[in-house]
Amino acid sequence: MDQDEGLTAVDNIVTQFNTYEDFLDSQITTVDLYYLEDESLARQLVELGYRGTGEIVKREDFEARKAAINIARQAERTQKKTLTSAGKELHDDFLKALAMREEDNRAGKLSTVIFIRDRNPHGQEVSGYIDYAHRLKSEDFEVYFNGKRRLLPRTTDMSFYNWDSHIAVCNSSPNYQVIADNPEGLLFKYKRDRKILNVDPKAHPGDNSTRIPIQTDLYAHVVLFDHVSRRKT
């Protein structure tokens, strides 16, 4: 179905005219103006339904729909602007995987934890777990999707380890509580539904969680953990 066919009569009118007065003027004929000799009076009669050549639309209905349509358009523009991966020509599977998950992570529909192991600009081997949704909100991913910089773990991420200096850091994020004292290995508790994410490759990742190894030419080792919250809101 064409988009215009799905619009109501009010929607058609609202999208056609910038203001309610413009709509009223479109309903006034030259004959009306000739006899009434008052444009303001002619508008009032159209608004009351006594004059006019088409659909009767109340001022409050027009203005309410106009506001709703403007809000929807602004939200769409904001969403397109927010998705930094939109319109990018991505060749590496890792960047493609991040792009596929960007919108849902921003919207809170999905929570992705990124494990990366590789060498930093100093040649040191580092690894860590990144809260993708948190990073999306706290920094601009344009440089990563454009290939100008590589996404690497930081000491401010949920987990960071430098294999050369043996520096190890753990931090809870807005979305996850880090459980570092577990004898079987590192665990992350998702704060919204309190489900445990187990990143041990030999263990099941947990309820509503999926482990996805990624083949990439950009890093030595990449694994994504997708968690879908089932908490009722």
Curated annotation (Swiss-Prot):
Keywords: Cytoplasm, Nucleus
Annotated disulfide bonds: none
InterPro entries: DUF4464 (IPR027887)
Tissue: Abundantly expressed in testis, specifically in spermatogonia and primary spermatocytes but not in secondary spermatocytes and spermatids.
Subcellular location field: Cytoplasm; Nucleus
GO cellular component: cytoplasm; nucleus
Primary site of residence: cytoplasm
Function: May be involved in spermatogenesis.
Protein name stated in the entry: Cilia- and flagella-associated protein 299
Species this chain originates from: Mus musculus (Mouse)
Organism classification: Eukaryota, Metazoa, Chordata, Craniata, Vertebrata
